[in-house]
Amino acid sequence: MQKTIRSQALIYRKFGDPLKVLQLETVEVPAEPGSGECLVEWLASPINPLDINRIQGNYAVRAELPVIGGSEGVGRVVKAGSGSRFKSGDHVTIFSANTPIWTEFGVVDDDELVKLDNRIPLDLAATLMINPPTAWIMLKKYVNLQKGDYIIQNSANSGVGRSVIEMCKALGYKSINIVRNRQNIEALKTDLWRIGADHVFTEEEFKGTSRQFLKSINVRPKLALNGVGGKSALQISSVLERGGTCVTYGGMSKKAHEFTTSALVFNDICVRGVAVGMWARQEEHLDEWNLCVDEVQKLAVAGKITAIPMEKVVLADHKTAIQKSLEGRSIKQLFVINSKASASHI
């Protein structure tokens, strides 16, 4: 009989309200990985919007039920099977967002794992494979930016937005950052300036001062990064230089993305879209993806990209964490999965 180990896992057996369908259960995991596999002790994983959409059944591709949740995180290899390219003690993350990760232990194919530099702090490592690569690809793939060039983005305080700010600073680009107005707006601006933002405006501020501001810097952005849609997409795409590019990676407003006829016809802007997870799995992009992962890790080790603010919770408190994620008024929730990776170590 095959030896197994018991593992606590967050599982949903039907799609629906995450507060109702997500349950903490005990599962049996093989104690010995097979050839080309690893037994991984998962340490930490965030709750991403993608996770909520999947549990609700709103994602483009529905997983086969039952499903262990999670789409991103960091783990430690406990045991590597024969022929594996990993070794015990390696820190790893997942290449595919379909790999179960809200569980203490799991057996994972080598092809679904990415080795991480063990020097990267665990909270950053847990959130390293979605937001920073998205920022990197958007900054590097679509426009040949040079030091001193300007980019503009909305949703600047999001995970992707913060990665964009830090990478622009590291690469020598200038960032114009648009955020929604809120009660603590001055504190938010100060935080974004702290991590490297060159300019920060609320949507209302930029609407009223964009002409004067662009005249003052005497240049227009070459690249606009759109994670919101609606009027916000119109706002940032309308100030691009002639022939500039607007890349859309999300639609937080849940409204159609708007672009003016003038920007498209007379300013000849290019509008693109990217889903980095899908892009990375296309064989023709493999070399570019590997370069992206290497560069992101170098920035992380050098301290040039940092972990976003997160609240650390254990799996047993998943309902509270999910509720906060659904409400959207709290900072991102990070599951500290294994008892050996207590909050004090992350």
From Swiss-Prot:
Residues 1-22 form a transit peptide. It is an enzyme of class 1 (oxidoreductase). Its EC number is 1.3.1.104. SMART domains: PKS_ER. It is found in: Mitochondrion. GO terms for cellular component: mitochondrion. Transmembrane segments: none annotated. The active site is at Y59. It catalyses: a 2,3-saturated acyl-[ACP] + NADP(+) = a (2E)-enoyl-[ACP] + NADPH + H(+). It comes from the Eukaryota. SUPFAM superfamilies: GroES-like, NAD(P)-binding Rossmann-fold domains. One of its GO terms (biological process) is fatty acid biosynthetic process. One of its GO terms (molecular function) is enoyl-[acyl-carrier-protein] reductase (NADPH) activity. NADP(+) binds at residues 131, 157-160, 180-182, 249-252, 274-276, 332. It holds the Pfam family ADH_zinc_N. Belongs to the zinc-containing alcohol dehydrogenase family. Quinone oxidoreductase subfamily. Homodimer. This is Enoyl-[acyl-carrier-protein] reductase, mitochondrial. It comes from Caenorhabditis elegans.
